[in-house]
Swiss-Prot record:
This is Dipicolinate synthase subunit A. It comes from Bacillus subtilis (strain 168). Dipicolinate synthase likely consists of DpaA and DpaB, since both proteins are required for DPA synthesis. The gene is dpaA. It is an enzyme of class 1 (oxidoreductase). Pfam families: AlaDh_PNT_C, DpaA_N. GO terms for molecular function: oxidoreductase activity.
């Protein structure tokens, strides 16, 4: 139970509702900012604006997956109010206050550092990334079906990257009967690809391996599908770029070549917001319990 913990949930989308539900069930005291259009009420949760939060008492601040903009504006799907997280807000929190977000940016990292508050980027955690790979691959399958006129079974698929998401995608597409090859750099990843019964190749040789593929799925957050590589692709190839914005594809050149390329980060929150929210809620409740234990609340 999180009885006695005071938590500010500032902004967010449908995923945040699962977090709020979990934390109220565990009897935390919740302040909700950016939820004024939400009809559903949560026992133990109080709707307010950001300047009404008693920051001096707040044990944790939970931001949306997207954190803030470069100016500190927080995304609020359930409100038309502009919510801005400022340095002054963090300065007023207790020294033990922890800030959670999915990702981060220079603005958020700077104000957290200036306030000397711990900032936890949840999407850097292995457990969340691996759990999130499940709705991610389901969303990727959905996009592949929607944007092709052939079955995944028997298609030629290249997956770029064998990280926490890439591994799940490669395994699942292979299970659906696709002919999957996977591009990676490290010798350990290339060995793992072989062990999985898939075809490995080094990303330095990417240009040679994209000539005959139907679907290219990128998980590498750097410009890997550049003009040189795209010039080797045929217009029939579908590119699904799952990397964080701006992705790893030269989208303008792909369009010029007649190649359909889709940037699709954040699929869990789009195709399965309830599950994605539950993943975050379960991990957050454990992390908050640790804070509670440390503070003896």
């Amino acid at each position: 139970m999180l009885t006695g913990l005071k938590i500010a949930v500032i902004g967010g989308d449908a995923r945040q509702l699962e977090i709020i539900r979990k934390l109220t069930e565990q009897q935390a005291d919740i302040y909700l900012v950016g939820f004024d259009q939400l009809d559903h009420g949560f026992t133990g949760a109080v709707k307010c604006n950001i300047d009404e939060i008693p920051f001096q008492q707040i044990d944790s601040i939970i931001l949306p997956v997207s954190a803030t903009t470069g100016e500190g504006v927080v995304s609020t799907v359930f409100s038309n109010e502009e919510v801005v997280l400022k340095q002054d807000h963090l300065d007023r929190t207790p020294a033990h206050c922890v800030i959670f977000s999915g990702i981060s940016n220079a603005y958020l990292e700077n104000i957290a550092a200036q306030a000397k508050r711990k900032l936890v980027k949840l999407f850097e955690r292995d457990d969340i990334a691996i759990y999130n790979s499940i709705p991610t691959v389901e969303g990727t399958i959905m996009l592949a079906i929607q944007h092709t006129d052939y079955t995944i079974h028997g298609s030629q698929v290249a997956v770029l990257g064998l990280g926490r998401t890439g591994m799940t995608i490669a395994r699942t597409f292979a299970a659906l009967g696709a002919n999957v090859k996977v591009g990676a750099r490290s010798s350990a990843h290339l060995a793992r690809i072989t062990e999985m019964g898939l075809v490995p190749f080094h990303t330095d040789e990417l240009k040679e391996h994209v000539k005959d593929i139907d679907i290219c799925i990128n998980t590498i957050p750097s410009m890997i599908l550049n003009q040189t590589v795209l010039s080797s692709m045929t217009p029939k190839t579908l590119i699904l770029d799952l990397a964080s914005r701006p992705g790893g594809t030269d989208f303008k050149y792909a369009e010029k070549q007649g190649i359909k390329a889709l940037l699709a980060p954040g699929l869990p929150g789009i195709v399965a917001p309830k599950t994605a929210g539950q993943i975050l809620a379960n991990v957050l409740s454990k992390l908050l319990a640790e804070i509670q234990a440390e503070e003896g609340k």
